[in-house]
C-alpha cells in the first residue's frame, strides 16, 4: 500500500501544479535566472542551469520564457535573490521543508511563519526537521520507457542508487519509474539514463523522507491546505513533507 500511497501523492501534486501553471512558470523562470547568474549562461557548461531548463521544459514552459529568463541574468538588471530553507511541522507532526528564493528575507520569513500558524503548523529552526530527509537526485520515466528490469539495469549502469516502479493498477498515467541517485551525481546519472532510455519526464534535486507519517482524511486535508497555502506564495519554490496516505484517503481528497 505504501508504494501506491507515494504515487497517489505524486499524482495529487501534479494535479495541483496544473492548476498553478502560471505560478509554476514564474517559479521555473526564477530558478533559471538564478542558475544562469551564478554560473555560465550556457546550459551545456552549467549543470544547475541545464537541470533547471530541462525541468522547465518538462512542465511545458515556453521556449521564449526560458530564453528571457537566461537573458535577464546576463543583462545585469535582474534582482538578487537569496535562497533560504525553512523547516517546520504540519498537522499531526508531519515534517515540512520549504525552499524559497526571495529579494526580501523579512517579508518571506513573516509570510511563511504566518502560513504555518494559520494552517495548524508551526515554523521551527533550520535543522529542526532536515535530519528526517536526504538530499537526492530524482529522475522519473513513464512506464512506456521499459519494464522494471530494463529500468533497473539502466539505472545500475548509470550509477543510480535505487529504483521504484509502480504499475499504476493498469493505468499507465498513474504509474511510472522513479530513479534515485546521490545529489552530486544527478547530472551524470541523468545524462547516462537519457542515452539509454531517452528523455526523462522529470530530473531534479529533491528532499527524500527517511521516515513517513501516515495520515487519515482529516489530517491529510489540513496538511494539503498548508502545502497549498505555502505554494501560493511567490517566494516559495518547493514544499516537501514526509507523509503518506492510503489510496482510500487519496480518493476522498480528490472528490
Swiss-Prot record:
Keyword Ribonucleoprotein found: no
Transmembrane segments: none
Pfam families in alphabetical order: TACO1_YebC_N, Transcrip_reg
Subcellular location: Cytoplasm
Similarity comment: Belongs to the TACO1 family.
HAMAP family: Transcrip_reg_TACO1 (MF_00693)
The protein's name: Probable transcriptional regulatory protein Jann_3380
Amino acid at each position: 500500500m505504501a508504494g501506491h500511497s507515494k504515487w497517489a501523492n505524486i499524482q495529487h501534486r501534479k494535479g495541483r501544479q496544473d492548476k498553478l501553471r502560471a505560478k509554476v512558470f514564474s517559479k521555473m523562470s526564477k530558478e533559471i535566472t538564478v542558475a544562469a547568474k551564478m554560473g555560465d549562461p550556457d546550459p551545456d557548461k552549467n549543470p544547475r542551469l541545464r537541470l533547471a531548463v530541462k525541468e522547465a521544459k518538462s512542465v511545458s514552459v515556453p521556449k521564449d520564457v526560458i530564453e528571457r529568463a537566461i537573458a535577464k541574468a546576463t543583462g545585469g538588471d535582474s534582482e538578487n535573490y537569496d535562497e533560504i530553507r525553512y523547516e517546520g511541522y504540519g498537522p499531526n507532526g508531519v515534517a515540512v521543508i520549504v525552499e524559497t528564493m526571495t529579494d526580501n528575507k523579512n517579508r518571506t520569513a513573516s509570510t511563511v511563519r504566518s502560513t504555518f500558524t494559520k494552517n495548524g503548523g508551526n515554523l521551527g529552526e533550520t535543522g529542526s526537521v532536515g535530519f528526517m530527509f536526504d538530499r537526492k537526485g530524482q529522475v522519473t520515466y513513464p512506464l512506456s520507457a521499459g519494464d522494471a528490469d530494463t529500468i533497473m539495469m539502466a539505472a545500475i549502469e548509470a550509477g543510480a542508487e535505487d529504483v521504484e516502479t509502480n504499475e499504476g493498477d493498469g493505468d499507465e498515467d498513474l504509474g511510472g519509474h522513479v530513479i534515485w541517485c546521490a545529489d552530486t551525481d544527478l547530472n551524470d546519472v541523468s545524462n547516462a539514463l537519457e542515452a539509454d532510455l531517452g528523455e526523462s519526464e522529470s530530473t531534479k534535486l529533491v528532499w527524500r523522507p527517511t521516515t513517513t507519517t501516515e495520515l487519515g482524511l482529516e489530517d491529510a486535508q489540513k496538511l494539503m491546505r498548508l502545502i497549498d497555502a505555502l505554494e501560493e506564495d511567490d517566494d516559495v519554490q518547493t514544499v516537501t513533507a514526509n507523509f503518506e496516505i492510503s489510496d482510500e484517503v487519496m480518493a476522498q481528497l480528490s472528490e
